[in-house]
Protein backbone atom coordinates (compact mmCIF):
# COMPACT_ATOMS: atom_id res chain seq x y z
CA UNK A 1 0.00 0.00 0.00
CA UNK A 2 1.38 3.39 -1.00
CA UNK A 3 0.73 6.36 1.23
CA UNK A 4 0.27 9.36 -1.05
CA UNK A 5 -1.73 11.30 1.55
CA UNK A 6 -1.23 15.07 1.37
CA UNK A 7 0.91 14.82 -1.78
CA UNK A 8 0.50 17.43 -4.51
CA UNK A 9 -0.26 16.25 -8.05
CA UNK A 10 1.52 18.76 -10.30
CA UNK A 11 3.37 16.61 -12.85
CA UNK A 12 4.11 12.91 -13.31
CA UNK A 13 7.79 13.87 -13.01
CA UNK A 14 7.16 13.85 -9.25
CA UNK A 15 6.04 10.21 -9.11
CA UNK A 16 7.76 6.84 -9.45
CA UNK A 17 6.48 4.18 -11.86
CA UNK A 18 5.13 2.23 -8.86
CA UNK A 19 3.23 5.29 -7.62
CA UNK A 20 1.77 5.91 -11.09
CA UNK A 21 0.67 2.27 -11.24
CA UNK A 22 -0.92 2.73 -7.83
CA UNK A 23 -3.04 5.63 -9.17
CA UNK A 24 -4.04 3.45 -12.14
CA UNK A 25 -4.89 0.45 -9.94
CA UNK A 26 -6.94 2.65 -7.62
CA UNK A 27 -8.77 4.20 -10.59
CA UNK A 28 -9.56 0.71 -11.91
CA UNK A 29 -10.92 -0.33 -8.51
CA UNK A 30 -12.98 2.86 -8.11
CA UNK A 31 -14.41 2.40 -11.61
CA UNK A 32 -15.46 -1.16 -10.81
CA UNK A 33 -16.98 -0.03 -7.52
CA UNK A 34 -19.01 2.69 -9.26
CA UNK A 35 -20.26 0.23 -11.88
CA UNK A 36 -21.28 -2.34 -9.25
CA UNK A 37 -22.75 0.11 -6.75
CA UNK A 38 -20.21 -0.78 -4.06
CA UNK A 39 -18.28 2.49 -3.89
CA UNK A 40 -17.14 3.53 -0.41
CA UNK A 41 -16.95 7.27 0.27
CA UNK A 42 -13.50 8.26 1.53
CA UNK A 43 -13.82 12.05 1.27
CA UNK A 44 -16.90 12.70 3.41
CA UNK A 45 -16.97 16.24 4.74
CA UNK A 46 -14.02 17.39 2.60
CA UNK A 47 -14.23 20.74 0.82
CA UNK A 48 -12.52 21.20 -2.54
CA UNK A 49 -11.85 24.40 -4.50
CA UNK A 50 -11.75 24.17 -8.30
CA UNK A 51 -9.91 27.12 -9.89
CA UNK A 52 -10.50 27.33 -13.64
CA UNK A 53 -8.78 30.13 -15.55
CA UNK A 54 -9.49 28.24 -18.79
CA UNK A 55 -12.73 26.72 -20.06
CA UNK A 56 -13.28 23.01 -19.46
CA UNK A 57 -15.75 20.20 -20.04
CA UNK A 58 -14.08 16.91 -19.09
CA UNK A 59 -11.77 18.17 -16.33
CA UNK A 60 -14.44 20.16 -14.51
CA UNK A 61 -17.05 17.42 -14.79
CA UNK A 62 -14.55 14.77 -13.69
CA UNK A 63 -13.57 16.69 -10.55
CA UNK A 64 -17.18 17.60 -9.67
CA UNK A 65 -18.66 14.12 -10.22
CA UNK A 66 -15.66 12.36 -8.67
CA UNK A 67 -15.82 14.55 -5.57
CA UNK A 68 -19.60 14.12 -5.24
CA UNK A 69 -19.31 10.33 -5.59
CA UNK A 70 -16.79 10.36 -2.75
CA UNK A 71 -18.86 12.59 -0.44
CA UNK A 72 -16.92 15.84 -0.88
CA UNK A 73 -18.25 19.33 -1.61
CA UNK A 74 -16.84 21.55 -4.37
CA UNK A 75 -16.69 25.27 -5.04
CA UNK A 76 -16.16 26.20 -8.70
CA UNK A 77 -14.18 29.39 -9.30
CA UNK A 78 -14.37 30.15 -13.02
CA UNK A 79 -12.36 32.53 -15.22
CA UNK A 80 -14.19 35.51 -13.71
CA UNK A 81 -14.94 33.95 -10.31
CA UNK A 82 -11.76 34.72 -8.39
CA UNK A 83 -9.08 37.39 -8.06
CA UNK A 84 -6.15 35.04 -8.75
CA UNK A 85 -3.50 36.72 -10.87
CA UNK A 86 -5.54 39.92 -11.26
CA UNK A 87 -6.13 41.49 -7.85
CA UNK A 88 -4.48 38.79 -5.78
CA UNK A 89 -1.29 36.80 -6.29
CA UNK A 90 -1.23 33.02 -6.55
CA UNK A 91 0.65 32.88 -3.23
CA UNK A 92 -1.97 34.96 -1.42
CA UNK A 93 -4.84 33.05 -3.05
CA UNK A 94 -3.25 29.78 -1.93
CA UNK A 95 -2.94 30.94 1.67
CA UNK A 96 -6.58 32.04 1.75
CA UNK A 97 -8.05 28.93 0.12
CA UNK A 98 -5.76 26.65 2.12
CA UNK A 99 -7.46 27.92 5.30
CA UNK A 100 -10.94 27.06 3.96
CA UNK A 101 -10.46 24.01 1.75
CA UNK A 102 -8.98 20.53 2.07
CA UNK A 103 -7.79 20.37 -1.56
CA UNK A 104 -7.36 22.75 -4.50
CA UNK A 105 -7.49 22.03 -8.24
CA UNK A 106 -6.01 24.53 -10.71
CA UNK A 107 -6.51 24.70 -14.49
CA UNK A 108 -4.92 27.64 -16.21
CA UNK A 109 -1.75 29.09 -17.62
CA UNK A 110 1.86 28.76 -16.46
CA UNK A 111 3.10 25.70 -14.57
CA UNK A 112 4.70 28.12 -12.12
CA UNK A 113 1.21 29.19 -10.96
CA UNK A 114 0.14 25.71 -9.86
CA UNK A 115 3.57 25.23 -8.27
CA UNK A 116 3.15 28.46 -6.30
CA UNK A 117 -0.31 27.36 -5.14
CA UNK A 118 1.20 24.08 -3.96
CA UNK A 119 4.04 25.86 -2.15
CA UNK A 120 1.75 28.11 -0.12
CA UNK A 121 -1.61 26.31 0.26
CA UNK A 122 -0.71 23.74 2.91
CA UNK A 123 -3.22 21.30 1.38
CA UNK A 124 -2.98 19.01 -1.68
CA UNK A 125 -2.99 20.90 -5.00
CA UNK A 126 -3.87 19.13 -8.26
CA UNK A 127 -2.91 20.22 -11.77
CA UNK A 128 -5.99 20.18 -14.02
CA UNK A 129 -3.96 21.56 -16.99
CA UNK A 130 -1.28 24.18 -17.54
CA UNK A 131 0.39 25.50 -20.66
CA UNK A 132 3.24 23.05 -20.07
CA UNK A 133 1.63 19.90 -18.66
CA UNK A 134 -1.60 17.90 -18.28
CA UNK A 135 -0.90 15.02 -15.87
CA UNK A 136 -4.48 13.99 -15.05
CA UNK A 137 -5.09 13.40 -18.76
CA UNK A 138 -2.14 11.01 -18.91
CA UNK A 139 -3.54 8.83 -16.12
CA UNK A 140 -6.80 8.56 -18.06
CA UNK A 141 -4.90 7.70 -21.23
CA UNK A 142 -2.86 4.98 -19.54
CA UNK A 143 -5.91 3.45 -17.83
CA UNK A 144 -7.61 3.32 -21.24
CA UNK A 145 -4.57 1.66 -22.83
CA UNK A 146 -4.54 -0.92 -20.02
CA UNK A 147 -8.20 -1.70 -20.73
CA UNK A 148 -7.73 -2.13 -24.49
CA UNK A 149 -4.40 -3.97 -24.71
CA UNK A 150 -3.55 -7.33 -23.23
CA UNK A 151 0.01 -6.32 -22.41
CA UNK A 152 1.76 -4.06 -19.88
CA UNK A 153 2.48 -0.40 -20.54
CA UNK A 154 6.20 -1.06 -20.95
CA UNK A 155 5.41 -3.11 -24.07
CA UNK A 156 3.31 -0.37 -25.69
CA UNK A 157 4.55 1.51 -28.76
CA UNK A 158 3.00 4.96 -28.77
CA UNK A 159 3.17 7.84 -31.28
CA UNK A 160 1.99 11.36 -30.60
CA UNK A 161 1.40 12.99 -34.00
CA UNK A 162 0.97 16.73 -34.54
CA UNK A 163 2.05 19.77 -32.55
CA UNK A 164 5.19 18.52 -30.83
CA UNK A 165 5.52 21.67 -28.73
CA UNK A 166 2.22 21.58 -26.86
CA UNK A 167 1.39 20.46 -23.33
CA UNK A 168 0.05 17.06 -24.40
CA UNK A 169 3.30 16.17 -26.16
CA UNK A 170 5.16 17.14 -22.98
CA UNK A 171 2.82 15.32 -20.60
CA UNK A 172 2.65 12.14 -22.67
CA UNK A 173 6.43 12.00 -23.01
CA UNK A 174 6.88 12.34 -19.25
CA UNK A 175 4.33 9.62 -18.52
CA UNK A 176 5.61 7.31 -21.24
CA UNK A 177 9.23 7.35 -20.10
CA UNK A 178 8.18 6.80 -16.49
CA UNK A 179 6.31 3.67 -17.55
CA UNK A 180 9.00 2.30 -19.88
CA UNK A 181 7.14 2.80 -23.17
CA UNK A 182 8.48 3.13 -26.72
CA UNK A 183 7.38 6.73 -27.29
CA UNK A 184 7.60 8.80 -30.47
CA UNK A 185 6.75 12.43 -31.21
CA UNK A 186 5.98 12.82 -34.91
CA UNK A 187 5.95 16.52 -35.69
CA UNK A 188 7.35 19.06 -38.18
CA UNK A 189 10.88 20.27 -37.43
CA UNK A 190 9.49 23.81 -37.36
CA UNK A 191 7.55 22.95 -34.18
CA UNK A 192 10.27 21.57 -31.89
CA UNK A 193 9.60 19.82 -28.59
CA UNK A 194 11.25 21.44 -25.56
CA UNK A 195 14.89 20.34 -25.77
CA UNK A 196 15.53 20.43 -22.02
CA UNK A 197 12.47 18.27 -21.36
CA UNK A 198 13.50 15.79 -24.06
CA UNK A 199 16.95 15.51 -22.46
CA UNK A 200 15.43 14.94 -19.01
CA UNK A 201 13.03 12.32 -20.38
CA UNK A 202 15.88 10.49 -22.12
CA UNK A 203 17.69 10.33 -18.77
CA UNK A 204 14.61 8.74 -17.19
CA UNK A 205 14.24 6.40 -20.18
CA UNK A 206 17.75 5.09 -19.58
CA UNK A 207 16.60 3.99 -16.11
CA UNK A 208 13.18 2.57 -17.05
CA UNK A 209 13.96 0.97 -20.40
CA UNK A 210 11.80 3.44 -22.32
CA UNK A 211 12.66 4.79 -25.77
CA UNK A 212 12.19 8.38 -26.94
CA UNK A 213 12.16 9.24 -30.66
CA UNK A 214 11.55 12.72 -32.09
CA UNK A 215 11.00 12.67 -35.86
CA UNK A 216 9.28 14.52 -38.68
CA UNK A 217 9.05 11.29 -40.70
CA UNK A 218 5.48 10.00 -40.40
CA UNK A 219 6.10 6.53 -41.81
CA UNK A 220 9.10 5.97 -39.54
CA UNK A 221 7.33 7.46 -36.52
CA UNK A 222 4.13 5.40 -36.62
CA UNK A 223 5.57 2.06 -37.76
CA UNK A 224 4.59 -0.77 -35.44
CA UNK A 225 2.65 1.49 -33.07
CA UNK A 226 -0.17 0.33 -30.82
CA UNK A 227 -1.50 3.85 -30.26
CA UNK A 228 -1.69 6.95 -32.45
CA UNK A 229 -2.54 10.05 -30.43
CA UNK A 230 -3.16 13.63 -31.48
CA UNK A 231 -4.43 16.91 -30.10
CA UNK A 232 -5.76 20.18 -31.50
CA UNK A 233 -3.31 22.11 -33.66
CA UNK A 234 -3.88 25.39 -31.81
CA UNK A 235 -4.04 25.24 -28.02
CA UNK A 236 -6.07 27.36 -25.60
CA UNK A 237 -4.40 30.72 -25.09
CA UNK A 238 -2.58 30.77 -28.43
CA UNK A 239 -3.45 33.79 -30.64
CA UNK A 240 -5.68 33.37 -33.70
CA UNK A 241 -2.77 34.62 -35.81
CA UNK A 242 -1.00 31.24 -35.56
CA UNK A 243 -3.85 29.29 -37.18
CA UNK A 244 -2.70 29.75 -40.77
CA UNK A 245 0.93 28.77 -40.18
CA UNK A 246 -0.04 25.82 -37.97
CA UNK A 247 -2.52 24.50 -40.55
CA UNK A 248 0.08 24.74 -43.32
CA UNK A 249 2.67 22.85 -41.27
CA UNK A 250 0.38 20.26 -39.69
CA UNK A 251 -2.09 19.28 -42.43
CA UNK A 252 0.27 16.49 -43.63
CA UNK A 253 0.21 15.19 -40.03
CA UNK A 254 -3.57 14.75 -39.85
CA UNK A 255 -4.23 11.32 -38.34
CA UNK A 256 -6.45 9.33 -40.70
CA UNK A 257 -7.24 5.78 -41.82
CA UNK A 258 -4.17 5.70 -44.04
CA UNK A 259 -1.92 6.57 -41.10
CA UNK A 260 -3.49 3.85 -38.95
CA UNK A 261 -2.74 1.38 -41.75
CA UNK A 262 0.86 2.67 -41.87
CA UNK A 263 1.37 1.27 -38.36
CA UNK A 264 1.06 -2.24 -39.79
CA UNK A 265 -0.81 -3.13 -36.60
CA UNK A 266 -4.41 -4.33 -37.13
CA UNK A 267 -5.09 -3.78 -33.41
CA UNK A 268 -3.83 -0.17 -33.35
CA UNK A 269 -6.01 2.39 -31.57
CA UNK A 270 -6.61 6.11 -32.01
CA UNK A 271 -6.69 8.42 -28.98
CA UNK A 272 -7.36 12.14 -28.48
CA UNK A 273 -7.77 14.16 -25.28
CA UNK A 274 -10.72 16.09 -26.86
CA UNK A 275 -12.28 18.34 -27.95
CA UNK A 276 -11.45 17.33 -31.54
CA UNK A 277 -12.02 19.22 -34.77
CA UNK A 278 -13.09 16.31 -36.97
CA UNK A 279 -16.12 17.87 -38.69
CA UNK A 280 -17.98 21.15 -39.21
CA UNK A 281 -20.48 20.66 -36.39
CA UNK A 282 -19.01 23.35 -34.11
CA UNK A 283 -18.67 27.13 -34.38
CA UNK A 284 -14.89 26.75 -34.67
CA UNK A 285 -15.30 23.98 -37.24
CA UNK A 286 -17.51 26.19 -39.39
CA UNK A 287 -15.05 29.08 -39.08
CA UNK A 288 -12.14 26.85 -40.14
CA UNK A 289 -14.14 25.65 -43.15
CA UNK A 290 -14.93 29.22 -44.20
CA UNK A 291 -11.39 30.56 -43.72
CA UNK A 292 -9.23 27.63 -44.78
CA UNK A 293 -11.51 25.27 -46.68
CA UNK A 294 -10.89 22.38 -44.27
CA UNK A 295 -13.76 20.21 -43.06
CA UNK A 296 -11.51 18.31 -40.64
CA UNK A 297 -8.32 19.23 -38.82
CA UNK A 298 -6.05 17.04 -36.68
CA UNK A 299 -8.05 13.84 -37.23
CA UNK A 300 -10.27 12.67 -40.07
CA UNK A 301 -13.95 12.22 -39.31
CA UNK A 302 -13.76 8.69 -40.70
CA UNK A 303 -11.07 7.63 -38.22
CA UNK A 304 -12.66 9.50 -35.30
CA UNK A 305 -15.89 7.51 -35.77
CA UNK A 306 -14.18 4.21 -36.62
CA UNK A 307 -13.60 1.01 -34.64
CA UNK A 308 -10.01 2.16 -34.03
CA UNK A 309 -11.13 5.16 -31.98
CA UNK A 310 -11.30 4.79 -28.19
CA UNK A 311 -11.67 8.49 -27.41
CA UNK A 312 -14.90 8.21 -25.43
CA UNK A 313 -13.59 5.42 -23.21
CA UNK A 314 -10.62 7.73 -22.67
CA UNK A 315 -12.92 10.67 -21.82
CA UNK A 316 -14.89 8.61 -19.28
CA UNK A 317 -11.66 7.56 -17.63
CA UNK A 318 -10.85 11.19 -16.85
CA UNK A 319 -13.38 10.92 -14.02
CA UNK A 320 -12.16 7.61 -12.61
CA UNK A 321 -8.50 8.65 -12.64
CA UNK A 322 -9.13 12.14 -11.23
CA UNK A 323 -11.19 10.53 -8.49
CA UNK A 324 -8.24 8.23 -7.78
CA UNK A 325 -5.89 11.21 -7.46
CA UNK A 326 -8.23 12.90 -4.97
CA UNK A 327 -8.81 9.73 -2.94
CA UNK A 328 -5.10 8.84 -2.85
CA UNK A 329 -3.98 12.30 -1.74
CA UNK A 330 -6.94 13.43 0.38
CA UNK A 331 -9.18 10.49 1.20
CA UNK A 332 -9.45 8.59 4.47
CA UNK A 333 -7.57 5.32 3.95
Curated annotation (Swiss-Prot):
Major localisation: cytoplasm
Keyword field: Arginine metabolism, Cytoplasm, Transferase
Localization annotation: Cytoplasm
Residues annotated as binding L-ornithine: 167, 231, 235-236
Residues engaged in binding carbamoyl phosphate: 56-59, 107, 134-137, 273-274, 318
Domain of life: Bacteria
GO terms of biological process kind: arginine biosynthetic process via ornithine; arginine catabolic process to ornithine; citrulline biosynthetic process
InterPro entries linked: Asp/Orn_carbamoyltranf_P-bd, Asp/Orn_carbamoylTrfase, Asp/Orn_carbamoylTrfase_sf, Asp_carbamoyltransf_Asp/Orn-bd, Orn/put_carbamltrans, OTCase_ArgI
Keyword Transferase: yes
The keyword Transcription belongs to this UniProt entry's keyword annotation: no
Gene3D superfamilies in the record: Aspartate/ornithine carbamoyltransferase (3.40.50.1370)
EC number: 2.1.3.3
One term under GO cellular component: cytoplasm
Catalytic activities: carbamoyl phosphate + L-ornithine = L-citrulline + phosphate + H(+)
Gene Ontology MF annotations: amino acid binding; ornithine carbamoyltransferase activity
Pathway field: Amino-acid degradation; L-arginine degradation via ADI pathway; carbamoyl phosphate from L-arginine: step 2/2
Similarity comment: Belongs to the aspartate/ornithine carbamoyltransferase superfamily. OTCase family.
PANTHER family xref list: ORNITHINE CARBAMOYLTRANSFERASE, ORNITHINE CARBAMOYLTRANSFERASE, MITOCHONDRIAL
Record NCBIfam families: orni_carb_tr, PRK04284.1
Function: Reversibly catalyzes the transfer of the carbamoyl group from carbamoyl phosphate (CP) to the N(epsilon) atom of ornithine (ORN) to produce L-citrulline.
HAMAP family: OTCase
Protein name: Ornithine carbamoyltransferase
Organism: Clostridium botulinum (strain 657 / Type Ba4)
Gene behind the chain: arcB
